[in-house]
Structures are given as C-alpha cells and as structure tokens.
Amino acid sequence: MNQTTKLCAATTLALGTLIGATVVGTASPIHQEAQAATTPYYTYHGYIGHNANFIMDKHFINAIKYDNVTFNGIKLAKTNATKKVEKYDQTFKGVTAKGNEANQLQFIVKNNISLKDIQKAYGKDLKKENNKTKESDSGIFYYQHSKKSLGIWFVVDHNRVVEVTVGHTPYKTSK
C-alpha cells in the first residue's frame, strides 16, 4: 500500500506541474514590440559666437535634413509670423506668439571657420548662391536637403565664414 500511495502522489505532482506550466506558458501573451525610429534632432543652448563649430557636426547636418533643430528653446519651423526676437547672440525671425517656434535664425560667427571646413562637412551638397561675387572664396553658400526642408546659409568673406542663417526662408543678410 505504501508503494501505491507514493505512485499516486508522484503522478499527481507530475500532472499538476505539467498542467501548471502549460497554463502559465499560455497565460502570458507574447510581446513583440516594434521600436519606433528616432528622428534626428539637434538642440543648442547658450551663446554661439566663438563656439560655432557645431555647424560642421554630422548630427547637426542630419537634424537640418529632418527639420528638427532647436536653439535656446525655439524650434525652427515654418511659420507665418513676423515677430523678431533677440536671444543671447542670435536673432530669431518669424517667431510665433507663444515664442516657441521661429522661421529663421541668424548669428555672427566669431571664430575661424573656413570655406574649406564647411565644404568638407557638407560635401557636394554645399552650393554657391547665384555666384554674385567673382571671387571663389567669397559669397553666400548654402545647404538645403529639399526646397521644403530647413536650409543653412553661410556668408563667406575671403575664405572665412562670418555669418550663418538657418531656416525655411531664403537668406537675407542681417547687415
């Protein structure tokens, strides 16, 4: 009788474990979550003046391509506004009433960034606007992935970048 009790107990335990494992296995749903693609972005805080090297950063260039650039809490976006705001050493144009979006950003470059530096960073996508100057190392150079995306314009004077504009509207000098 002792062996029969042990056999029944072992069978009950084995069956209980098998059924329990099966129930637990099917009770938890399988999650196959898709990872959302992250849109490239670039955020800048503070003064730019002597620290404009970020304009050659591949992450900044990629963020321009994807229209996802923010400076000092103001996102560059297509706006119909006309308000102009000075923040740190930057001029924002087309700032919305809430002050969180602007159509264009301009700043003066105070460190030595050369035409060759931006040509290396932007490659063959960097173009010269209208060839208004006969000098090859001066004029307005720009990069714009498509006509509907953000663009960046560089004012170059004798191989030196002196002013930068980032925005959706064509460049107009601040001078």
UniProtKB/Swiss-Prot annotation:
Subcellular location: Secreted
One annotated Gene Ontology cellular component of this protein: extracellular region
The entry's keywords: Secreted, Signal
Record bears the keyword Signal: yes
The keyword Transport belongs to this UniProt entry's keyword annotation: no
Region forming the signal peptide: 1-36
NCBIfam families membership: IsaB_fam
Entry's family note: Belongs to the IsaB family.
The protein, known as: Immunodominant staphylococcal antigen B
